[in-house]
């Protein structure tokens, strides 16, 4: 086991300054954001924790009662307890339901409470730069260039360096009933780190980016939540350790955020998603301020619930992950091939058959004709691409021979389904160049419409229904007058669209088109999000996708763990009633025969 006690290499200067606990610049303060409602009295949970009687003052043991009397008393007490439990549980649920549209509490502290909380945070952390109310910093932590959901700034941003620091912040938040929003890589596309309208505390975990332990013999690694997956893999490579962490969402994504959104990426067809077995355990600060470690480091365990997974996909609403143990996997040789098809249906059929052959596939990506046109226009490729629906394969295997065999099987299957121009990289550099064209999806897409911005979204359907989804969505966008590229993790039915727009009018068109795409995916037995998460943007679809029982169970878990709804309020959990402006279900169009 080697212990890495330095920050990751991505900002060596910045990280070393973080280690000292303070930054050099001083930041002016501004008043806290106004709150809407006063705090309310402590819950039963607080009473329980604060009323334990020391053993030395416990009452003496009473005289032994007769068995019959004991039985009658037990039955009576059971009835009373059940009745009170039912009353308080249902009273609390009814009270919560009346307090917000989601059925979760929204009774936060007053503006004065928030001011006192900020002052206590400054006193607790001492260093001015550990607690900031600088307007620019608040804006960065409440708004995003990655999406077009409404922004809202926090009242204060705190920069912890350890789990203990996070606990201190959460205890202050509890004391003053101040909402808490976790923040790290800021790569979210669905508004996950927006502050609630009342303001609150933003906990910026980006400074907690250290690798704490590497266990090469066990193929795992312990790191803080702010560590970025790319930096982790680069560190392993620099140390000559032939292992890597295979989840590959957007550049800059951190381990904490990846857990929170249940992310994946292009490698999902081979390695699965964050909801698989890639996170062995996590250190989590609960809304009460209690710290738990979800399990030990064994590769598998059947001891009780898999508590780690409770926090994967919870989007910071149940707890704040501060450390995690992640599984690593061997680095194997890879190569890349590209092939063109007459249409998406035949490309999908070819990809499905290749996967069923058991070929060593690490990634298989669908890029539509508009994407290939955009790649040519972007001008960064080493070649001129045929502007047709295409598949990008990344093959993986232990030897060069195994890679060639996999590529040959893929070529034969592709040609069987009408594929043409199969091109296999001749060396590592050519493979890197080919794959880079796929990774440039955002920038090449924006080149398709000069001066445009882009709305990126994702849905996922069973693989057999992906051609129908792509066809209907492209037809919809064409009729709407929007320019878009389509990229899909075709091996698992995950479909991404980048909708370009220049004007506010086109932005609204894009917003409605995304809504129709989501409704279409759910109607095809799919999901509103394959890997971006729910956040603000997709929460209204959960009742339709998951059903009332499942959503209410999620809310019950939330109320139990976070009765004050302090952790990341406004995300994930949908309103109790459907929106009055909800659009009708789109008509499904039968795909053309091609």
What are these regions (language model features)?
Residues 2-594:
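Noncatalytic alpha-helical scaffold of FAD-dependent oxidoreductases
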């Amino acid at each position: 086991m080697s212990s890495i006690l330095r920050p990751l290499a991505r900002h060596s200067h910045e990280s070393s300054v973080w280690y000292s606990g303070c930054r050099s610049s001083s930041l002016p303060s501004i008043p806290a954001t106004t709150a809407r409602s006063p705090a309310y009295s402590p819950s039963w949970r607080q009473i329980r924790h604060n009323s334990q009687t020391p053993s030395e003052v416990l009452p003496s043991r009473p005289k032994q009662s007769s068995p019959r009397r004991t039985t009658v008393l037990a039955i009576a007490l059971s009835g009373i307890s059940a009745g009170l439990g039912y009353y308080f549980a249902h009273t609390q649920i009814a009270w919560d339901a009346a307090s917000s549209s989601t059925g979760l509490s929204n009774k936060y502290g007053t503006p004065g409470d928030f001011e006192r909380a900020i002052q206590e945070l400054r006193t607790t952390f001492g260093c001015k730069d550990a607690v900031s109310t600088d307007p620019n910093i608040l804006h960065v932590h409440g708004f995003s260039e990655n999406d077009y959901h409404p922004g809202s700034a926090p009242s204060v941003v705190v920069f912890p360096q350890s789990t203990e620091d996070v606990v201190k912040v959460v205890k202050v938040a509890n004391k003053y009933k101040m909402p808490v929003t976790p923040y790290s890589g800021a790569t979210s596309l669905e508004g996950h780190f927006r502050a609630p309208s009342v303001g609150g505390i933003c906990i910026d975990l980006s400074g907690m980016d250290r690798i704490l332990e590497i266990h090469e013999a066990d193929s795992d690694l312990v790191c803080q939540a702010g560590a970025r997956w790319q930096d982790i893999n680069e560190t392993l490579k620099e140390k000559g350790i032939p292992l890597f962490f295979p989840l590959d969402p957007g550049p800059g994504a951190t381990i904490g955020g990846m857990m929170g959104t249940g992310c994946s990426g292009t490698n999902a067809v081979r390695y699965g998603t964050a909801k698989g077995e890639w996170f062995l355990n996590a250190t989590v600060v609960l809304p009460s301020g209690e710290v738990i470690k979800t399990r030990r480091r064994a590769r598998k365990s059947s001891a009780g619930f898999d508590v780690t997974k409770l926090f994967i996909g919870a989007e910071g609403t149940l707890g704040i992950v501060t450390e995690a143990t992640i599984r690593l996997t061997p680095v194997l040789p890879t190569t890349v091939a590209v092939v063109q098809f007459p249409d998406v249906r035949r490309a999908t059929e070819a990809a499905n058959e290749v996967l069923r052959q058991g070929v060593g596939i690490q990634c298989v990506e669908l890029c539509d004709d508009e994407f290939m046109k955009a790649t040519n226009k972007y001008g960064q490729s080493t070649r001129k691409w045929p502007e047709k629906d295409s598949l990008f394969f990344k093959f993986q295997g232990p030897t060069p021979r195994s890679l060639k065999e996999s590529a040959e099987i893929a070529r034969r299957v592709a040609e069987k389904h009408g594929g043409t121009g199969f091109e296999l990289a001749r060396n590592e550099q050519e493979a890197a160049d080919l794959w880079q064209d796929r990774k440039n999806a955002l920038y090449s897409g924006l080149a398709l419409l000069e001066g445009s911005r882009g709305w990126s979204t994702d849905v996922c359907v069973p693989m057999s229904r992906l051609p129908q989804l792509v066809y209907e969505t492209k037809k919809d966008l064409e009729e709407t007058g929007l320019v878009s590229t389509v990229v899909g993790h075709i091996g698992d039915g995950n479909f991404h669209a980048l909708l370009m727009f220049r004007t506010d009018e086109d932005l609204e068109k894009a917003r409605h088109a995304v809504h129709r795409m989501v409704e279409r995916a759910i109607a095809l037995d799919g999901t509103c999000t394959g890997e971006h998460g729910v956040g603000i943007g997709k929460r209204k679809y959960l009742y339709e996708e998951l059903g009332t029982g499942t959503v209410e169970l999620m809310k019950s878990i939330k109320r139990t763990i976070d009765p004050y709804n302090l952790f990341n309020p406004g995300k994930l959990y949908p309103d109790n009633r459907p929106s009055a402006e909800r659009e009708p279900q789109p008509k499904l169009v039968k795909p053309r025969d091609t």
